[in-house]
Amino acid sequence: FREDATFVKKFRSEAQAAAGLTHPNIVNVFDVGDDEGVYYIVMELIEGITLKEYISKKGKLSVKEATSIAIQVSMGLEAAHSHGIVHRDVKPQNIIISTDGKVKVTDFGIARAASSNTISSNVMGSVHYSSPEQVRGGYSDEKSDIYSLGITLYEMVTGRVPFDGDTTVAIAIKHLQEEMVPPSVYTENLPYSLEQIILKCTQKSVGRRYEKMEDVIADLKHSLIDPQGNFVTLSSVDNEAKTVVISDEELGEIKNTPRASS
């Protein structure tokens, strides 16, 4: 990417913005610069493993542990959103669990820089966690992060991603058109409230998701004290959520994204 002037400019701008973020659930960025044409970013050193590695090790997480991790991730993202920064690449690989149990979100500047007009929004990430609007190459905002958080939470409680396939295109189309198998199908006794939170986060229609990350946090905390409660509000299915038609141009955009990797 260093040969791409637009990317370099975007990377420096967004990484510097990320450097202004200080939060217990974010890997802090201390410095951004270049040394004789080599661009670098100095980040907080965290001893630990990624959430992806942790899930692979345990198979699936307990409800309490998954909810606790989701709350911490949400708090980090909420702090970023309050500063006008959208991550756009939320996935277990970009979430670190430190040796003392603290959960931190990383790669803010890189993720945002990769969403410049000259680079596909999926270049830096995995389509397994991308929102429908991202795989279509459209506008993405805080609600895109909410969708990706929902997919991540789904994987934590089931040990699998909801949409998979042999190619990026196949997975992208599933995000756009295929109904998600409820996580309770794979995890017995999954609390009703937590399943509803996951389903609300991962609605294909942006308007049917949570409005803000703080609303996600509130419901996640509520689910810990009222696991079977019916307090998550899901709006009725609209036409946008029922049918998504992919144009030839959009299909071409999807095909130009890198091969899928989970």
Regions found by a protein language model. Give the residues of each.
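AlphaC helix of the eukaryotic protein kinase fold
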Residues: 1-20
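Activation-segment/catalytic-loop signature of the eukaryotic protein kinase fold
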Residues: 32
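Conserved short submotifs of the Hanks-type protein kinase catalytic core
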Residues: 36-50, 54
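Activation segment signature within eukaryotic-like protein kinase domains
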Residues: 69-70
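Protein kinase catalytic-loop region centered on the HRD/HxD motif
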Residues: 73-85
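C-terminal lobe helix-coil module of Hanks-type protein kinase domains
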Residues: 128-231
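Juxtacatalytic C-terminal regulatory tail of Ser/Thr protein kinases
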Residues: 211-260
